[in-house]
Amino acid sequence: LRSFVFIERISEVTDVFASERSFAEVSRKIASDAGVADVSGYTDYGRVWLEFRDTVVDDLDPRSTVIVLGDARTNGRDPHEHAFAKIAAAAGRTFWINPEPKLYWNYGDSVMGVYEPYCDGVFECWTTHQLETFVRAVAQPGSVTQAARRRR
């Protein structure tokens, strides 16, 4: 299991989760050491997908599951759909958990609709009930949707 965090840049934090059990300490270490913010402090999904593709995609295989937790807001930057598509194609399953209400998806700078076709499941997740729904769906054997696979 590998874990990554991002804002403008992506950073692997697997070691932080392996060495710390306190949520407060994990949060502190990530905030101070992860190097995820560059200049603006605004999310840059496109840059993140390019970096992830270039550094991690070769480690993905059909047994891999990629889970993204984010609002898909690009702040007007290029979403680099092709990079995300390559990541999703390399993984066995790709899921997206969006903490914003669905009402706000694809509104303003949200590009959820750009990434959704490459995902096996996209979940609105801003309540504990919605989180439970996501966990149940991911835990189901064969939860990969054939429609999502055909679009890749």
Model regions: which residues?
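MIDAS-like acidic motif and immediate structural context at the N-terminus
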Residues: 1
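Short beta-strand-loop
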Residues: 6-31
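Cofactor-binding loop segments of dinucleotide-utilizing enzymes, especially the Rossmann-like FAD-
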Residues: 6-8, 71, 99
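Short acidic, S/G/P-rich loop/turn micro-motifs used as interaction or catalytic elements
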Residues: 10, 73-76, 102-103
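Short, well-ordered secondary-structure micro-motifs
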Residues: 14-18, 78-79, 107
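Von Willebrand factor
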Residues: 25-64, 101, 106-107
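Exposed acidic/Ser/Thr-rich ligand/metal-binding surfaces
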Residues: 49-93, 124, 137-145
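Von Willebrand factor type A / integrin I
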Residues: 85-152
